[in-house]
């Protein structure tokens, strides 16, 4: 019976054949232990010299790391194994013998591993992180589909910036200027006016010269937009979504969390509702904690966000930021013209902002005024203004950074490990 490592539990005490690679091995005179991986998981294959043909045992001893093979054997239960099973090997068919695999079991530096990212992905740690990333993506689609959202695809090439910033990658689009997208938000707003509730999911690009553990040049965003949804209702959807992701990782990624040494009690504590504090309250809290380097109107940096998150020890919304700190499309608060109806969701354990969102301006004249105030060309945003001319309604949206969320839920220190091939300030290869 040909199967995968993830499915061997169905075949206890039965013979199976698995296509796999050698992740590692060790052997003595009479027994060889093969650490097998096939992409679905890892299992130990045990080859006993007295129980297999001579050529099979010789091959088990000579086969090299990352060689590929078909291995046939009987599935045994083993409480010592992380998966609960091992394979008593009876036959080995070599597909390809690898030579001089560069990532040996010894310790390697980060730059070396990043240079060999195409191979580093094969390690147990990277396998676990990618599985958690995949589960978060799958659970995202489940969450929004169950709530009546429509998936909307936004363009990667755009003629303007949703954020109105200069951190853009420029290219020529025949005879015009074009930019790699920083966000699908504006297009999602158009989608929400047609379909009610939508979400986009795709890569975004920021030409930021940042080298922190939280920043990537290319990263993936989940961006819902919702018609007839005001600020407070949007916050409720955000916290339900994040709690849903945490539960999904706990429910489906126990082996991966164990492999990464993640403290699962931290994830078990992620339950809605989340605390909410205003920017003003956050500023007061920071001053109580001895931060004298920040005044009203300043944005919070990583140390500030970490201090606020540590105070609550769970995700916390910081709401009502100064208008001057936020993009042109955010709705001013009805009771204070100097703050907007927005929120950043700050993850605990030093992982920083994972969601930014707001109620959007739905008044044509106010949006036009904001575009002019930010010196943004009205002709480039004419289509966006149109959304306020033909049946405009209150609406809200937010963006969740996938890589930061994966880092937080998996307990990974740096976001470079949370995307298959990271693009960093000093790295465009492989």
From Swiss-Prot:
It is found in: Cytoplasm. GO terms for cellular component: cytoplasm. It is an enzyme of class 6 (ligase). It comes from the Bacteria. One of its GO terms (biological process) is asparaginyl-tRNA aminoacylation. The keyword Ligase applies. Disulfide bonds: none annotated. Pfam families: tRNA-synt_2 (PF00152), tRNA_anti-codon (PF01336). InterPro entries: Aa-tRNA-synt_II (IPR004364), aa-tRNA-synth_II (IPR006195), aa-tRNA-synth_II/BPL/LPL (IPR045864), Asn-tRNA-ligase (IPR004522), Asp/Asn-tRNA-synth_IIb (IPR002312), NA-bd_OB-fold (IPR012340), NA-bd_OB_tRNA (IPR004365). GO terms for molecular function: asparagine-tRNA ligase activity; ATP binding; catalytic activity, acting on a protein; nucleic acid binding; transferase activity. Keywords: Aminoacyl-tRNA synthetase, ATP-binding, Cytoplasm, Ligase, Nucleotide-binding, Protein biosynthesis. Its EC number is 6.1.1.22. It catalyses: tRNA(Asn) + L-asparagine + ATP = L-asparaginyl-tRNA(Asn) + AMP + diphosphate + H(+). Belongs to the class-II aminoacyl-tRNA synthetase family. Homodimer. This is Asparagine--tRNA ligase. It comes from Shouchella clausii (strain KSM-K16) (Alkalihalobacillus clausii).
